[in-house]
Amino acid sequence: MKNQLILTAASVGALSGCTQQENRPKDLNVIYILADDLGYGDLGCYGQTKIHTPNIDRLAAEGMLFTQHYAGCTVSAPSRSALMTGQHTGHTPIRGNKGGTGDDGVEGQHPIPADTYTLGKMFRQAGYVTGTFGKWGLGSPGSEGDPTYQGFDEFFGYNCQALAHKYYPTHLWHNREKMLLDGNDLAHTTQYSHDIIQERTLDFIRRNKERKFFAFLAYTLPHAELLVPEDEIIEAYRGRFEEKPYAAKSGDYSPEGKHPIHYCSQPEPRTSFAAMVTRLDRYAVSYTHLTLPTKA
């Protein structure tokens, strides 16, 4: 992860279009969306014109647009640790992408310590139900850095950030339980991970709409590998970009040659990237369509 961009820190007030201080509810639901390897120049609200992001652009127009909301580091784990703890990169306990890669059953990164004060713990202490969905990367399943031990009532997604770069993985995690994805073996593309994560996120919001909640949505999109379902989103971009096909490098495949270890070949990298950004935009609008009341 070279760059991170926060798409929106959305609250009930923002989603409902409230602009007057007196009209805002006392306790706001908070939805924090984090994208991976998305530059500010990839969004329409910052002047980009080739990739469609109408829903994110609308959130920016009706809310607040930041120009100095920086990633904490140049790679995933320490950057996420800085965000989760509020600490400068020089003080946060995670200094690099150390840990497993998913090979040979080893999964997950070096854990943040048990006594770390995280956003999840802060919101839980304030009476919020908390959930995180997508990419974690701050401690392997069952370790002290496991999200369910770091203030989150519910987690669904990739525990290991190395595996999070596969959009058709063999499994995801629900809390500390591994959920196998039938039909996926890294070479076959049956269940697109982020569509599943999106549905679980919406389910969390619906189940908790009568309570105040904090949802941290850490998407991998549009980080490589550049891979999306064959649907109307990618079809809309075909033929619009000059392409330079990406070929998987020698050694990027498992010894038996059955699946790519790193990134798969992609004949349409620019088309695929654009479709990934627009897919993220589609996900974002889902939250604005939900009614999210809080108790008085």
Predicted feature residues:
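Sec-dependent signal peptide recognition
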Residues: 2-8
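C-terminal motif of bacterial Sec signal peptides marking the signal peptidase cleavage site
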Residues: 16-17
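Active-site-proximal cap/lid insertion segments
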Residues: 24-28, 35-51, 58, 67, ...
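Hydrophobic beta-strand core positions in alpha/beta domains
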Residues: 32-34, 132
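A short, Lys/Arg-enriched amphipathic alpha-helix followed by its capping loop at the start of a domain
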Residues: 54-62, 119-122, 126
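Catalytic-site neighborhoods of secreted/periplasmic enzymes
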Residues: 82-187
